[in-house]
Structure formats: structure tokens, C-alpha cells
Regions:
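Compositionally biased, non-globular sequence tracts
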Residues: 3-4, 8, 12-20, 108, ...
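Short N-terminal edge-element motif at the start of the domain
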Residues: 9-54
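Generic amphipathic alpha-helical segments used as scaffolds and interaction surfaces in large
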Residues: 23, 27-30, 128-140
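Amphipathic, interaction-prone secondary-structure segments
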Residues: 40-79, 166-167, 171-184, 222
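Amphipathic alpha-helical protein-interaction segments
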Residues: 59-61, 75-100, 161
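Compact, glycine/acidic-enriched structural inserts
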Residues: 85-125
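Acidic, proline/glycine-rich low-complexity IDRs
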Residues: 132-226, 231
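Tandem repeat scaffolds
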Residues: 188-285
């Protein structure tokens, strides 16, 4: 069909865009972090205007409704513990037109490439192609921001916003398609919760991803082949735990004491062991 021919004709343009956009996000990583910082400042001001006491769930989105109008901005949506039932959510917007120049250029190229197809390929078809790229672009931005925001506390990025002890920041267009950027759960848990969650992880592979363990003692376990990306142990004691072939990419251990532990065969890319103390802990293998 004409639409299939058009898709094939523009496939190289789309591939070039993905490469260009990926490079652009990396090049402008600091600017994307600045977008988050600016949005938090605006959200704090809006919370004060609305008399909003705190937020728990924070969502960044590049909305399709904005993209259709080439209105390149991100929405930051803040809700309290009521989540969807929050009767007074707060929202603010930050312009990102310059950061999304590659997307705008792709749009122009797709329109130009449509010459000769007549009514067989319409504006709706072009928009659908662009919408497919939004999800890929969201993922690129998330990959960069996860690491840019790791030192959020030292940088004071979220200071303007009053948050609950548990709060989470996500990025994506729809709430069920979002990715976590930051999650904090500064609530001390009963020791049994750790064991329960590990047991659940055997059936739910991503159960421990982004999990947060605060001021606890976690001891005497052998954990094999588990997905524990971006897990955090804060001001805790991790004792006699063998992490074997686990994925601990982006994990954090601020103020934590590790005693008699080993990380044989683990993926520790981007792991943060600053401000830790170690006793008889091995990273061999």
C-alpha cells in the first residue's frame, strides 16, 4: 500500500533521527537536569499558591496533545498519597523546544517526504509515526536523568517541593508506561519485610528494582541472579550477604556499613559506594 511504501521510504530518516536524538540527549544532559530543577521550583511555587501541603507522586510527561501542536514542553504533575483520587493535584509546564529540535526537524522531513502520495498518506499517519518516537525518546531521557539526579540531595534539586517520606518521580506519557527516575522511601521497615520481598522477587523478577531500604540490618543471605538495579541501602548494615551474579547497576549504599559481603560476578556499573564503610567485603570476580 501507499502507506507501507511511505513508511519504508522514511525509515532511514527515522533511524537517523534516533541516532541524532540519542546524541543530543547525552550532549544536553545538564540541560535536561536543569529542566527538572526549574520544574521543581515552579511546582513549589504552585503548591504554595494552592495551599498544597505535600506531594508523593511526581510525573513528567511529554504530552501528545502538545506535540500535535508543536508545543514542545514537559508537564510536571504532582499528587499526594491519594494518587488518582487527589482532588487538588498541582501541575506546571517547562518549555523544552530547543532540546527537542531533532524531533521538530524529523516532523518537517516526514511532511516533505509525503509529496507524491496524495491523500493516501495524511497528517494523522505522520503523527502516528512521530508518536512512536516519543516512547523511544522518553527512554533516552530517562537513561540520562537517572544518573544526573542521583545526587539530587546534594544539589538541592527537590528542595522547593515538600515531599512525603515515601515519594517517587517518574517520566513518561501515561502513568502505566512511565519509568522511575528517583524513588525514596525513608521509612524504617520491619526486618521481615526484607525477607518477604526477596521471596516475592523469585516470582516477580523486578520486585527489587528501585527498592529502598532505610536504617535497617540485612544479614545472612545468599542472593543469586537477581535483578536489583537501582536498589538503595541508606544508613543501613548489610552483613554476611553474598550477592552472586546479581544486576546491581546504579545501586546506592549511602552511609551504609558492609561487613562480610561479596559481589562475585555482579554488574556494578554505576554503583555508588561513597560514604560507605567496608569490613571483609570482596568485589573479586
Amino acid at each position: 500500500t501507499a502507506l507501507q511504501n511511505y513508511r519504508e521510504a522514511v525509515s532511514r530518516k527515522i533511524a537517523a533521527f534516533r541516532s541524532h536524538m540519542g546524541d543530543s540527549v547525552l550532549e544536553h544532559a545538564e540541560d535536561w537536569e536543569a529542566v527538572v530543577e526549574k520544574a521543581m521550583k515552579l511546582l513549589g511555587e504552585q503548591m504554595e499558591k494552592q495551599g498544597k501541603e505535600y506531594v508523593c507522586f511526581l510525573y513528567f510527561s511529554l504530552l501528545k496533545s502538545d506535540t500535535i501542536n508543536r508545543n514542545y514542553r514537559v508537564q510536571l504533575h504532582g499528587l499526594d498519597m491519594s494518587w488518582y483520587m487527589d482532588k487538588e493535584p498541582v501541575e506546571v509546564y517547562v518549555d523544552v523546544k530547543e532540546l527537542l529540535t531533532p524531533l521538530d526537524e524529523l516532523w518537517n522531513e516526514l511532511v516533505c517526504a509525503n509529496q507524491g502520495y496524495g491523500v493516501s498518506v495524511n497528517e494523522y499517519d505522520i503523527q502516528n509515526l512521530l508518536f512512536d518516537e516519543l516512547t523511544i525518546m522518553d527512554n533516552m531521557i530517562c537513561q540520562v536523568l537517572r544518573y544526573r539526579l542521583r545526587d539530587w540531595e546534594k544539589k538541592g534539586i527537590f528542595e522547593p517541593v515538600t515531599r512525603s517520606p515515601y515519594w517517587v518521580l517518574r517520566w513518561g506519557e501515561y502513568r502505566d508506561q512511565t519509568e522511575i527516575l528517583v524513588q525514596t522511601d525513608r521509612v524504617e521497615k520491619d526486618p521481615g519485610v526484607w525477607k518477604t520481598e526477596l521471596s516475592k522477587a523469585a516470582r516477580e523478577p523486578e520486585k527489587m528494582v528501585f527498592s529502598y531500604w532505610y536504617k535497617g540490618t540485612y544479614a545472612d543471605r545468599t542472593i543469586r541472579d537477581m535483578d536489583m538495579r537501582f536498589i538503595t541501602f541508606e544508613e543501613s548494615t548489610v552483613q554476611n550477604i553474598v550477592f552472586q551474579n546479581c544486576n546491581l547497576e546504579g545501586s546506592r549504599f549511602p552511609g551504609t556499613r558492609l561487613t562480610g559481603c561479596s559481589f562475585e560476578g555482579c554488574n556494578l556499573w554505576g554503583a555508588d559506594f561513597r560514604e560507605c564503610t567496608f569490613e571483609q567485603t570482596s568485589f573479586a570476580g
